[in-house]
């Protein structure tokens, strides 16, 4: 699996979060349902994205619990029910997951068990564990769908 080390400039997002479990299959169900709710809330708040859309999903560990934070780049207005977050500039290990969502945890396994242990980099994981970047290349469960993992 190919990866790159890239410096990402600081950016800000607004989004919503949901608590996850310790079970992969259940978390896929929770996150899939939550994306539907999040996208509906974007539409209700007049935050729908059209051309050149981008969305992020952050995996956050807080007080021993796991949270999934769906977000978009910050706008001028932060609607009720949305949370604002600043993402600091760091060097990131970036991987592209290509394929169905069903294989996403296999990509994470490779990142954390094969790639990272064989690099000189140590994940900070202070603000979040990792995040996913979604853009026009993402297509639900398509074999050529692309999700960037940072």
Language-model-derived ranges and their functions:
Residues 1-150:
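A solvent-exposed interaction/effector surface
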